[in-house]
C-alpha cells in the first residue's frame, strides 16, 4: 500500500491510498457489499453510476456462504464478483457476536454458531487472516474483542488487553505469510477499542499503533452512544494515531457523522445506512432526508435532489419513485440505492475538494445551513 497526505485543512485530511487494484482518494466512503454485492446493484451499476474505488465485504457471511475456499477457486473476490477495484473485508467478529446465540470468547478466539444452520465454528486471529487470504481482499481487518456498550470497566479493560494480544499474533502471522508469498499484495489494519472511555482509548491506540500495521481503525462506536460522545471519542483517539497511515472509522454513519469525523481527522468510512435507508424509503439530499412514502410526493415532478447529478435525479421524478416504492417494485430498490450511494460518494468528493482548497470550514457551514441547522 502506498499512502500519502495530499493536503490538510486544520485536522481534516485529503489523502491518496494506492492498493493493487485501485487508487483511492480520501475522505472515502466505502459502500457495503456484505455477501459480495452491494444490495440491489451489480458490478456494472457500481462502475457506471457510483464509481467507488473500494467497497466492503463481510468475512463472516462469505465464510458461512458460499465459503472462502469456493471464492478462492472462483478467482477470489475480484474474479467471483467481477468488481475490479479494491475490497476491504472486516474480520467477521462483529457478526459472530451479533448473529449467533451462545457466543463464547476465550484467549484463543470466538466460538459461535452459524445463523444459517446452527453449525459450530471457531474464529481465531490466524483463522480470519487465512479466510481473508482466500478472499483476496486488498485490506484485511484483524479479529478484535468487541464490547457492547454500556459495559463495565473490567470488561472494557479485558477487551483492550485481548485485542492487543490478538493484534500482536495477527501481524506476526501476516508478515510471516508474506515472506512465504501469501497475501503479498494484501494490507492489514488493526482496530482500536475502548468504548467512550478516554483512558482506555488512549491505552488501546498506543499499544496497537506501535505495531507494524498498514492502517488503523476506530471500532466500537456508532452502537447507540450519543453523537457527541462519538465525536469526542474520535477527536481524542486520532491524536494517538500515526499521521502517516490511514484512519478508518468503522460503521459510521449519517452525512452529518461523515462531515464531523472528517473534521476530526478520519479518512475512511463504511455504513449500511445509505443502502438500507434507500430500501426503506429514506433518500438523502443536500437539504436533508426525503421520506418518499409521504403523500405530498404523489404528483411531485421534481427530482429527489435538484442539486444531485446522479442518473436517478437526472431522469426520474419523486412521484415516480414514490409510485415504485408503494408498488414494491424491485426497480425502486435499484434506483434509490444508486441515488443514496451517489449522494454519499459525492459528499466525500466535495469534502476532499474543500480540503484541497483550504475552505473546509466554509463547506461545513454551508452543509449545515442547507439543512436549516
Curated annotation (Swiss-Prot):
Gene Ontology biological process: queuosine biosynthetic process; tRNA-guanine transglycosylation
Coiled-coil regions listed: none
Record bears the keyword rRNA-binding: no
Needed cofactors: Zn(2+)
NCBIfam families: Q_tRNA_tgt (TIGR00430), tgt_general (TIGR00449)
Subunit description: Homodimer. Within each dimer, one monomer is responsible for RNA recognition and catalysis, while the other monomer binds to the replacement base PreQ1.
Name of the protein in its database record: Queuine tRNA-ribosyltransferase
Annotated source species: Sulfurovum sp. (strain NBC37-1)
